[in-house]
Swiss-Prot record:
<dbReference type="InterPro" id="IPR023716">
    <property type="entry name" value="Prolyl-tRNA_ligase_IIa_type2"/>
</dbReference>
<dbReference type="InterPro" id="IPR004500">
    <property type="entry name" value="Pro-tRNA-synth_IIa_bac-type"/>
</dbReference>
<protein>
    <recommendedName>
        <fullName>Proline--tRNA ligase</fullName>
        <ecNumber>6.1.1.15</ecNumber>
    </recommendedName>
</protein>
<keyword id="KW-0436">Ligase</keyword>
<comment type="subunit">
    <text>Homodimer.</text>
</comment>
<comment type="similarity">
    <text>Belongs to the class-II aminoacyl-tRNA synthetase family. ProS type 2 subfamily.</text>
</comment>
<dbReference type="InterPro" id="IPR045864">
    <property type="entry name" value="aa-tRNA-synth_II/BPL/LPL"/>
</dbReference>
<dbReference type="InterPro" id="IPR006195">
    <property type="entry name" value="aa-tRNA-synth_II"/>
</dbReference>
<keyword id="KW-0067">ATP-binding</keyword>
<dbReference type="GO" id="GO:0004827">
    <property type="term" value="F:proline-tRNA ligase activity"/>
</dbReference>
<keyword id="KW-0030">Aminoacyl-tRNA synthetase</keyword>
<dbReference type="InterPro" id="IPR004154">
    <property type="entry name" value="Anticodon-bd"/>
</dbReference>
<keyword id="KW-0547">Nucleotide-binding</keyword>
<dbReference type="InterPro" id="IPR036621">
    <property type="entry name" value="Anticodon-bd_dom_sf"/>
</dbReference>
<keyword id="KW-0648">Protein biosynthesis</keyword>
<dbReference type="InterPro" id="IPR033730">
    <property type="entry name" value="ProRS_core_prok"/>
</dbReference>
<dbReference type="InterPro" id="IPR002314">
    <property type="entry name" value="aa-tRNA-synt_IIb"/>
</dbReference>
């Protein structure tokens, strides 16, 4: 993409309404625009990052055996009355009526609807286990939306729902998603720690939040430093191997870790003082096992191997991709702007043409652009006629992992300068060497 043709509305000043780093940088770098309280439009560069996050989530959900579907945003109130949550959910739920005066709602979550889909088609235990997921926009009417997309009213959510014949099967479904989440966050470039959590309005008897440590986190969290050194499950993880999954979950739940609501001072005192980490944290995922909480009132049953009907055991598993984008910024930035992990960076590299209109600079910039594009690097070419300082500031602000600087002096010497955004290190390379280095990273 050429910057001269790209919609990138950079803000020079810090927005007054932005309270935290991610909100400020997302507005300044032209990722989002606020349309009303807690509701945002995603602009081109923000949407690219969001889509990359969703791609990683999809790949890991599919790897774990989940099936993608797409449920509507508008749901019937009748389904929620079946589960008993229509009146219990509170004012966060946006209730509406259609022209026939039928009561509807803008879905804040999808347990009822997915249970209705399940009971309409699945009759036998032979069709289990089953895990259905979708990525869809949701709405919760927060009393005080703040922190940009970190706590917005409309947000993108990946929610998965598992169905099993019995508790043991449901536990393994929970373990599969637990391990899948560890891999997902690591691939996005975040170190997430699973912590026992309250089940809240979702209900159930087992729940973990996945927390990343960040100074601007909403919650106080406590964990053993051992988590910081645990190896994330690799690409060779076999999601059909119950023993392997159980071993991974055991390793990731044995050291102490708890949110403020679940914190136990007596257990905390057993952690060596030098291993105690007390910090702020951001929730990036939440998983629940809730047994027959929804299948019982909604009649979701299957015929078991004994010929009798059995209520299915269920779980739900959520990741907020839009929130995850903000969390990645909170975890990786500096005074100049965002520092994107490579996996979710909007572009693989930025090419900075220091002197557009100069034959040499234009020629080298085009050569780099073509070579990197053909290699799948997806570069952003800054071909705008602006002063060098403005070009550097833009590249640092939007946080591309690598910058390739093309200037008249370097071109005369057959070289370009390559800058690593994270470390700030610069090196001069001949043009072919720069192309080889960047294409090797694609």
């Amino acid at each position: 993409m050429r910057l001269s043709r790209y919609f990138l509305p950079i803000l020079k000043e810090n927005p007054k309404e932005a309270e935290i780093v991610s909100h400020r940088l997302m507005l300044r770098s032209g990722m989002i625009r606020q349309q009303s309280a807690g509701i945002y439009s995603w602009l081109p560069i923000g949407l690219k990052v969001l889509n990359k996050v969703c791609t990683i989530i999809r790949e890991e959900q599919n790897r774990a055996g989940a099936n993608e579907i797409l449920m509507p945003t508008i749901q019937s109130a009748d389904l929620w009355r079946e589960s008993g949550r229509y009146d219990a959910y509170g004012k966060e739920m946006l209730r509406i009526q259609d022209r026939q005066e039928r009561e509807m709602l803008f879905g804040p979550t999808n347990e009822e609807m997915v249970t209705d889909i399940f009971r309409s088609y699945v009759r036998s235990y032979k069709d289990l286990p089953l895990n259905l997921y979708h990525i869809q926009w949701k709405f919760r009417d927060e009393v005080r939306p703040r922190f940009g997309v970190m706590r917005s009213r409309e947000f993108l959510m990946k929610d998965a729902y598992s169905f099993d014949l019995d508790y043991e099967g449901a536990k393994m479904a929970y373990y599969r998603m637990f391990v899948s989440y560890l891999r997902t966050f690591a691939r996005v470039g975040l170190q997430a720690i699973p912590m026992r959590a309250d089940t809240g309005p979702i209900g159930g008897d087992l729940s973990h939040e996945f927390i990343i440590l960040a100074e601007t986190g909403e919650s106080q969290v406590y964990c053993d430093r051992a988590y910081l050194d645990l190896a994330v499950p690799g690409a060779d993880t076999d999601f059909r191997n119950d023993a392997q999954l159980t071993d991974i979950v055991t390793r990731w739940t044995t050291p102490y870790a708890a949110t403020d609501e679940m914190h136990d001072e007596a257990d905390w005192a057993k952690v060596k003082p030098e291993s105690q980490v007390s910090a702020r944290g951001i929730e990036v995922g939440h998983i629940f096992h809730f047994g027959t909480k929804y299948s019982e009132p909604m009649g979701a049953k299957v015929q078991g191997p004994d010929g009798k009907e059995h209520l299915v055991f269920m779980g739900s598993y959520g990741i907020g991709p839009s929130r995850l984008v903000a969390a990645a910024i909170e975890a990786s930035h500096d005074d100049a702007g965002i520092i994107w992990p490579k996996a979710i960076a909007p572009f693989g590299a930025g090419i900075v043409n220091m002197k557009p209109g100069d034959e040499g600079c234009d020629g080298v910039s085009e050569k780099l652009y073509e070579a990197l594009t053909n290699a799948g690097v997806d570069p952003l070419l800054d071909d705008k006629d602006e002063r060098p300082g403005a070009k550097f500031a833009t590249m640092d602000l939007i946080g591309l992992p690598t910058q390739v600087i093309v200037g008249p002096r370097g071109v005369a010497a057959g070289e370009v300068e390559v800058k690593d955004r994270k470390t700030g290190e610069r090196q001069s390379l001949d043009i072919e060497a720069a192309i080889n280095m960047l294409t090797a990273q694609a």
